[in-house]
Amino acid sequence: MRKFSLVGAALVALVGSAMAQPNFDTPSSVLIYPIVDSRLGQGMGTVISVTNTNRNRVINTNTNLPTGTVQVRYWYVKGTDPWTFTDIPELLTPNDILTVLAGNHNPEVELGFLIVIAEDPTNDALINFNYLIGDEIVIDVAGARTTNINAMGFKALYEGPEQPNGADLADRDGDGRAEFNGDEYERFPDLLYLSSFFEQSATMEGDLTFVALLGRDYRVGVNFLIYDNEEDQFSRNFFFVCWTRVALLGISSVFDSLGGSANEEQVGWCRIDGGDAVNILTGRVIFDAPILGAKTQRVLPYAGLEFGGLLHHSGENREESTPSGWVNQFPPSELP
């Protein structure tokens, strides 16, 4: 069991904010950016970058474009009722990078998340193009803070008929939806982990962001097992629809009650599992709901000391099909 003084915790935060966050992803065909915050009235903005690592500049005679060219479709998903989405296609040539300010790129979505999917530039088909990487910078002007978070990449797995740009079709059933079922694309993880958090206080605060692709009609449960410095375990439950960014104290008071000396900053961690997702219209239940997550932590007395990243993960979520399509797909079957 180890503890940090308040001064030591501040130094740890300073180092964490200065270093690049670890990247456990590899070039993929789908990128998911967990936070889009373009509330300009509150001094918030998000810078989104997408990079095409394909280097093939040989001209494709079918498209008259370099073979490594890809169309990427940005799907901005509104994180509040009615949880609608809008899409914007962009073209990336080999070794190209596109960086946009989300609020200018799509002013219709102030708060939510973003999915970027590789497509053939001539017919909009979903393609196996595992060359995309990306990240985002969430800017808090009022708090003088920025947070850099890598996009979470999902590789295309299906290798269907060759498309005009030379890439293989990723959409096996041709429904225009990216299905994270271990056949078309990689599955979502089974478990998430918050590897560490400081006890919440006047000087430390953090939040978690969760993303689910089940659509606006599902209330998604999240099950927490929280551990303190003494390895004591606390279980808590939380619910959201589609997307949420919630303070740790909005989940449970355990996050500010880890015990120990008042002169020492206590540290804990937690295991996070998607629980039951209930359709609020039909009552249908999806067990072990697939979710993604990201974290942000701040040291409040020090401007600029904010650091975040994707939650650690393990396993594969194996929830399968529903009467209206796959459990885990985008666009979701419950949205238009």
Language-model segments: residues:
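Sec-dependent, cleavable N-terminal signal peptides
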Residues: M1-Q21
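Gly/Pro-rich, tryptophan- and cysteine-flecked surface segments typical
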Residues: M19-P336
